[in-house]
Amino acid sequence: MIKEQNYRVWLLAFLYAGIYVFLIPWVDIIGKEFEDTANYLFRIIYLQEGGTEAHYSGIKWLLDEPVWRFIILALGETFNDYRLSLYFISFIGMLLYGSFFFRRVEFYVVMILLLNPMSVNLFIEQVRITLAFGLLLFAYDLSSKYLKIVIALIAFMIHASMPIFIGIYFILYYYNSRVEARKYYLITVGIALGMALFMKFGLNAILTAVGDRHAGYGDIAGGSSIAYSIVWFMIASIIAIFANFENDEERIFAGYAIVFMSFFFFGSIFGIYGQRYVAVIMPIIIIAIGYLPPHIKQGTYLFMFSYSLLMFKYWFELTLI
């Protein structure tokens, strides 16, 4: 029975990822190239034509994301169509997301994830963080602790932000059995505020000190509007107040969703680009909404679906300007 269920999960994930990545012409729909895609294409072409990049050792080597460098080189050597090679990475990332997602939610709920501009940007454009976090989701469902550690290390060497996602999980895991629900959710909001303050005032100084190329990125990227982020903070509040749990995993997932949705809100106040973090953990947010009482759950799903369609309208209008 378990093997049959796993087979169905991977089949659904395969079909979902294939349709989303290869059959929907996202670039034609929005009428312009994705910025990160253009940067990846330029890097592949540059390296294939004999271009060179700096090489590091020690901590700088880890922070330089060596596995992603290897993947970029491998894509250039393996594929003649470099854009197709990036779509292949999108497909793998979505497949890993799907293997996690379809074990925990009804099929129709996937449409909420699908019809969301943030998800399009994540899966089609920001393929590096999609692949890295997808590996973490895949590792979560493995039984072997050794494999979990190895895969987490690989994910870190694809995208250096992965320790943030891992660290938040273990903080929530630590407090889960030590505090009651009300304090637990106050802690999640406190973690989110602490993250925003750290990324605003501390992270850039650390990255500059170690000579990391990501130093100053937050200032360049800028923040999202408070009006946009407050919607996600409202959803976080609904989960914190009304969610019911059957086990520790569900409580931790809910806390995880609350942390990053709250961080998005606080980040918008401080001018930090927090939208991407919500996009990355979108499956966990949707799973956490599933812990709400039926009438609140359905209403929240409907609200998210409607809000996503509205954001698509706004997104398309911006791309046409």
Report each predicted region and the residues it spans.
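Start-transfer (signal-anchor) and selected internal transmembrane alpha helices
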Residues: M1-F22
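Transmembrane-helix motifs of polytopic, lipid-linked glycan transferases
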Residues: Y87-V105
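Juxtamembrane segments of multi-pass membrane glycosylation machinery
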Residues: F70-F88
